[in-house]
């Protein structure tokens, strides 16, 4: 047995507990004989004033949705109806194709695809996407024209930094639009200039404004077709005009086409790549929306550039180099991709479009019967519609965020405020849900409006 003395042994034991009257206590800033240590100036603390810390949440649908969801009364008697999301996979009726599930399961069970893949994607998967996309354009894409990404979101994350390499560059974004473009541009110090989509013209691009807002530093413009958040589908003639203006301005077109298979009306989906011979196109696509599997995280950037402008200017090289230092989709999902594209039956898409079409009809009808909100254009594609709030008819509703928060609190219905999409005092409604739930949700919106109408408002709706 070891005995400790009352001298050095006690001091050592006390120091071990940070209780010494000497230097050990100074560690706690409590020494009787020494001043407390000076505060450290942490160099990384300057980041508190950065874009991510100060304004990042303003450009996030997810963040604003969480904020609104916090207004819901958890003990309420009715289920929460999520009409703000773009993920109908939560509803069993929107389950993906069995062929897609089988392809992923088979790839996983081989045990051969638990490894890393090349940064740009597996060759067979790239070739399959190229073959799939070539069906809609007058020339053939190769595997080298396709870069696989972790969903459409990473495709945006890849393209924006590539365009931001030039000092002082700017990009043209639609208003309303998808806020991830705005956020990524801000993070990469790429200036944003907006062009409007015109509600009364089916949310067409205000083409006449493009030349006035662009300059020699403009590198690209973004179009979303079929459109999120408006539900529009652009015609061949309209897209041709966009391509001609892009050529005149010397810019490339970023075509967000993740909803390309979700067309509800008679107007067909025209890939922007059809006009790649006029102006180069980077098309963003994914399995997420058309196959209803956003959690699988598989998307792509496809290069439509038959004149090889993007190759000569090293845009394609820059994309490759970015992906080589970034993440990539799960390798087994990449391996499954050729079979998913080849084996998914037309009946699956027919079923999904049938559900969306039925729900879009309900959505449009219910909105038309509610005088407190206005829908300027019936949705033709995607899974969304933009709706104007007639706030002058409502009492104590200050703006779109106030409307959405109070609606969530009183009716347990979640909508997406238009301000996060670039249009204040509008809301985005998703109709990608079970028709009965959508009907219930829109009836709750109507009840909320009637309950909060101005006292001098005419009764009824």
From Swiss-Prot:
Tissue expression remark: Expressed in roots, but not in leaves.
Origin: domain of life: Eukaryota
Compositional bias of kind Low complexity: 11-29
Region annotated Disordered, chain positions: 1-29
Induction: By iron deficiency. No expression is detected when sufficient iron is present.
GO BP: any one term: tyrosine catabolic process
Catalytic activity: nicotianamine + 2-oxoglutarate = 3''-deamino-3''-oxonicotianamine + L-glutamate
Keywords from the named record: Aminotransferase, Pyridoxal phosphate, Transferase
SUPFAM superfamilies to which the protein is assigned, alphabetical: PLP-dependent transferases (SSF53383)
Transferase recorded as keyword: yes
A Gene Ontology molecular function term of the record: L-tyrosine-2-oxoglutarate transaminase activity
Alphabetical list of Pfam families matching this protein: Aminotran_1_2
Primary enzyme class: transferase
EC number of the protein: 2.6.1.80
Cofactor(s) listed in the protein's UniProt record: pyridoxal 5'-phosphate
Membrane-spanning ranges: none
Sites of N6-(pyridoxal phosphate)lysine modification: 289
Family statement drawn from the similarity comment of this UniProt entry: Belongs to the class-I pyridoxal-phosphate-dependent aminotransferase family.
Protein function: Involved in biosynthesis of mugineic acid family phytosiderophores.
Name the UniProt record assigns to this protein: Nicotianamine aminotransferase A
UniProt source species: Hordeum vulgare (Barley)
Gene name as annotated: naat-A
């Amino acid at each position: 047995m070891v005995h400790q003395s009352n001298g050095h042994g006690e001091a050592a034991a006390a120091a071990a507990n940070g209780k010494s009257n000497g230097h050990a206590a100074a560690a706690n800033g409590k020494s009787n004989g020494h001043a407390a240590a000076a505060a450290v100036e942490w160099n990384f603390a300057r980041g508190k004033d950065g874009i991510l810390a100060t304004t990042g949440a303003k450009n996030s649908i997810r963040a604003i949705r969480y904020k609104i969801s916090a207004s819901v009364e958890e003990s309420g008697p009715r289920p929460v109806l999520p009409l703000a999301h773009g993920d109908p996979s939560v509803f069993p009726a929107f389950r993906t194709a069995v062929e897609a599930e089988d392809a992923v399961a088979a790839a996983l069970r081989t045990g051969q695809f638990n490894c890393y893949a090349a940064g740009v994607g597996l060759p067979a998967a790239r070739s399959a996407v190229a073959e799939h996309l070539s069906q809609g354009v007058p020339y053939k894409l190769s595997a080298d024209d396709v870069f696989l990404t972790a969903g459409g979101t990473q495709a945006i994350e890849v393209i924006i930094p590539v365009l931001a390499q030039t000092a002082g560059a700017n990009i043209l974004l639609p208003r309303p639009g998808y806020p991830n473009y705005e956020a990524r541009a801000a993070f990469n110090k790429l200036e944003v200039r907006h062009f409007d989509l015109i509600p009364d013209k089916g949310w067409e691009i205000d083409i006449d404004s493009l030349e006035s807002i662009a300059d020699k530093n403009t590198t690209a413009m973004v179009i979303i077709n079929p459109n999120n958040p408006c539900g529009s589908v652009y015609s061949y003639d309209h897209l041709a005009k966009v391509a001609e203006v892009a050529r005149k301005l010397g810019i490339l077109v970023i075509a967000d086409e993740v909803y390309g298979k979700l067309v509800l009306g008679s107007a067909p989906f025209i890939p922007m790549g059809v006009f790649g011979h006029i102006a180069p196109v980077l098309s963003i696509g994914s399995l997420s929306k058309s196959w209803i599997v956003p959690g699988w995280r598989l998307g792509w950037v496809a290069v439509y550039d038959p004149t090889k402008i993007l190759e000569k200017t090293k845009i394609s090289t820059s994309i490759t180099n970015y992906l080589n230092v970034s993440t990539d989709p799960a390798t087994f999902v990449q391996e499954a991709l050729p079979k998913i594209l080849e084996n998914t039956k037309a009946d699956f898409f027919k079923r999904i479009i049938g559900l969306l079409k039925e729900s879009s009809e309900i959505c449009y009808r219910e909105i038309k019967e509610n005088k407190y909100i206005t829908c300027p254009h019936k949705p033709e594609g995607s899974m969304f519609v933009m709706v104007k709030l007639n706030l002058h008819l409502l009492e104590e509703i200050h703006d779109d965020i106030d409307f959405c928060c109070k609606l969530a609190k009183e009716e347990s219905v979640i909508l997406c405020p238009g301000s996060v999409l670039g249009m204040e005092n509008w809301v985005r409604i998703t109709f990608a849900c079970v028709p009965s739930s959508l009907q219930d949700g829109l009836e709750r919106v109507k009840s909320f409006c009637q309950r909060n109408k101005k006292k001098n408002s005419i009764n009824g709706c």
